[in-house]
Amino acid sequence: MEIKKFENFLAKSALAKNTVTSYLWTVNHFAVNYGEFNKENLLAYKGFLVEHFKPQTVNLRLQAINKYLEFIKKDRLKLKFVKVQQKNFLENVISDADYKFLKAKLKRDGLTEWYFVVWFLTATGARVSELLQIKVEHVQLGFLDMYTKGGKIRRLYIPKKLRDEAIKWIEECGITSGYLFLNRFGERITSRGIAMQLKHFASKYGLNPKMVYPHSFRHRFAKNFLDRFNDIALLADLMGHESIETTRIYLRRTASEQQQIVDKVVNW
């Protein structure tokens, strides 16, 4: 019964749908396998997670359990997160050269909608779920306001160069309102659809498929922004990060950049 109330509680929160689903699955899994939410069972569950999953996954599960403990007024039983070892380089980030190459190929081959998908992701720093929220009206306005997980408003800016070219494309297509990126059935395209299509383009144009996925372009936005305007506090705001510490990862080199520097510098 408490879990059903918890579901209703989450439904009224500002959490993403996938997060709510994940929280409910975790709490149900615990209840079925461990029963009562007491200290002994909670520590046993944490031990199971640590033994079988990566730290990031462990912390996601613990976050769900802690949210439920908060809900049933048992905050004192909250579990501590496990430490995640931070890598000293960024992995699988598309290079600026490959991003420009992909854009040029898509434009040349008349794949205009996908040309704009890639450009919007990289010029706005949008998460793919946020990209899907963009409407014609937002392009005309130059920005989109969204509510973040913490209930704050985050503004996603659409740069002038992108905005001007996108408006021309919209007018040529005769689109006057509604979501910008649609599938062949006239429905809003899905995150999975975008990811699959990007993999297809990577294969088609001879790019490393590990580098061509939606979030890679968000990483490229952050790297390019700091290269041109070194204000990490502003970047944190633009990306919707709760903490500036999350944004600091973009001060690091990518693995390929590190390799290039080592190859150039180390000659002994």
Where are the model-predicted features located?
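Conserved catalytic core of the tyrosine transesterase superfamily
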Residues: 1-268
